[in-house]
Regions:
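Short alpha-helical scaffold segments that flank and stabilize functional sites
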Residues: 51-54, 71, 79, 129
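Extracellular/periplasmic head regions of type IV pilus-like filament subunits
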Residues: 63-98, 109-113
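Low-complexity, S/T/G/P-rich flexible repeat/linker segments used as non-globular hinges
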Residues: 2, 101, 106-134
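Secondary-structure transition/hinge residues
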Residues: 56-59, 76-80, 134
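A generic structural signal for short, solvent-exposed coil/turn residues
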Residues: 36, 80-83, 101, 116-118
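Alpha-helical assembly-interface signal, strongest on the long, hydrophobic N-terminal helix that forms
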Residues: 2-69
Length: 134
């Protein structure tokens, strides 16, 4: 009977469950958070890149901002941003020359929004060069 009590077979499983599982929980939480942040940054980069492309392809500065805003909103909806996140989208256009669509000009779009789950501000920038023959 004493030999059966001293037998340690199966104790490694108990030690693993008691010690290792609680240590894995923070790792899983971190990886989930990291995946969420990475996904949000990918979405905002696409919005910035396509928004500035739409601006550069337009005929005037006014229509460029309108079309760019429409593109950004459409992409945000299609890539899964919530309506509260879409409402927090902020865009800032910087041009190296005025009007922005003049030849050899550079347009830089900085866009940001507030993630509804983490309440972090996610930001990205993209720039487009205007052809010298425009």
């Amino acid at each position: 009977m004493k030999n059966k009590l001293r037998d340690e077979s199966g104790s490694a499983i108990v030690e693993f469950v008691v010690l290792a599982i609680p240590l894995f929980i923070p790792v899983f939480i971190y990886l989930n958070s990291f995946a969420s942040v990475s996904g949000n940054e990918a979405v905002i980069r696409v919005m910035a890149r396509e928004g500035v492309r739409a601006y550069a392809a337009s005929d005037s500065d006014y229509s460029g901002r309108v079309v760019s805003g429409q593109v950004i909103e459409l992409i945000a909806q299609n890539l899964g941003l919530s309506s509260s996140e879409i409402e927090t989208i902020d865009t800032n256009y910087q041009c190296s020359r005025l009007p922005c669509l003049s030849a050899n000009s550079r347009i830089r779009l900085t866009i940001s929004y507030i993630d509804s789950r983490s309440h972090r501000t996610i930001e990205a920038s993209a720039q487009e060069n205007i052809s010298p023959w425009k």
